[in-house]
Amino acid sequence: MAAGMYLEHYLDSIENLPFELQRNFQLMRDLDQRTEDLKAEIDKLATEYMSSARSLSSEEKLALLRQIQEAYGKCKEFGDDKVQLAMQTYEMVDKHIRRLDTDLARFEADLKEKQIESSDYDSSSSKGKKKGRTQKEKKAARARSKGKNSDEEAPKAAQKKLKLVRTSPEYGMPSVTFGSVHPSDVLDMPVDPNEPTYCLCHQVSYGEMIGCDNPDCSIEWFHFACVGLTTKPRGKWFCPRCSQERKKK
């Protein structure tokens, strides 16, 4: 079920909740007011009894005491009714909270299921691409085998289609340029198996790269795309790992 459907159903279920809460709160306020009125009546009866107890007959005393007792009984009833209303209001809100928790759990389960389906689709798609790339590599290998003799005579350095060229940066920042080379082109280029790898991606050098200004950096060189750069920054630049280490210090 889509997120919009879960939200729509939940909003429908709580549509009358504000009115029900308002009604219960109003009833509790009414009970409070009636209790206060009874307490005032009890105070009046108690004062009357204390002030005229000596002049009243036994029957009159009993009548006043009975009125006070009945008023206290009604106060207790109003208090019990208020407690019941408060419990009903709490259960009403709690029911909707539990409904929301259940819908959220179902929504999260649906999201996980869709992520698994998407992952399976991506996996099967990548297998197809890998198979196509393998066939392409076989064709390239056959083409290279035709010129094997000439390749063997060429020095290893000539097999690298990419060559690091250090520039003289304006701000003393190490920088590397490789011309207009794209990562997709690197897959088709014959690379010396002994060629060193760089960057967080552990790939060979290609495209625009930048050097970390930390002399103790274990990686040193990074592809622009891998560290989120599009242009050479001004001043000194430190890689993500070295930046974290500098912050800790």
UniProtKB/Swiss-Prot annotation:
Annotated positions of the N6-acetyllysine modification? 112, 127, 129, 146, 148, 156
Q: Which SMART domains match?
A: ING, PHD
Q: Where Citrulline occurs along the chain? A: 133, 166
The segment annotated Disordered runs over 115-163
Q: In the record, what terms sit under GO molecular function?
A: histone H3K14 acetyltransferase activity; histone H3K4me3 reader activity; histone H4K12 acetyltransferase activity; histone H4K5 acetyltransferase activity; histone H4K8 acetyltransferase activity; transcription coactivator activity; zinc ion binding
Binding residues for Zn(2+) 1? 199, 201, 223, 226
Organism's domain of life?
Eukaryota
Query: How is expression of this protein distributed across tissues?
Result: Isoform 2, isoform 3, isoform 4 and isoform 5 are expressed in the mammary gland, ovary, spleen and muscle.
One of its GO biological process terms is:
regulation of cell cycle G2/M phase transition
UniProt free text on domains: The PHD-type zinc finger mediates the binding to H3K4me3. The N-terminal coiled-coil domain mediates homodimerization.
Official protein name in the record: Inhibitor of growth protein 4
- Species source reads Mus musculus
